[in-house]
Amino acid sequence: MTDRGDFAGQAALFTQDVVYDVSALGGGRLVGLATIREAALTLGDANPVAHHVTNIVLRETADGRVHAVSKGLGVMADGSTGSVTYEDTVERTPAGWRITHRVVRPRRTPLRD
């Protein structure tokens, strides 16, 4: 959805008041779908041309929410790539399951002993 600019479609993934924390990428905490849209449009050509999400692990919490951890791969227009970890809180809403909180953490250091 994001890659093709379908910002209205993001309501199928996120709550209207989602907290989208991209502080580790220098973007701060974005609150709400309108703020996420504006941030993406402000980035313009600096946006990835593709986002790929993989290795999704779900864990139900005692309060009925779901904690999701997944890997994200971003492909830039010049072909360079980056890797992040998404840490999501997912809650059941009247519209169905939606992400209420996301933290994006870049992976910049290789695994070492």
List each language-model region with its residue ranges.
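Residue-level detection of beta-strand scaffold positions
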Residues: G5, Q10, G82-Y86
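A solvent-exposed, acidic/Ser-Thr-rich amphipathic alpha-helical stretch
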Residues: F7-G72
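A beta-strand edge to alpha-helix "cap/lid" segment located at domain peripheries
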Residues: L43-D113
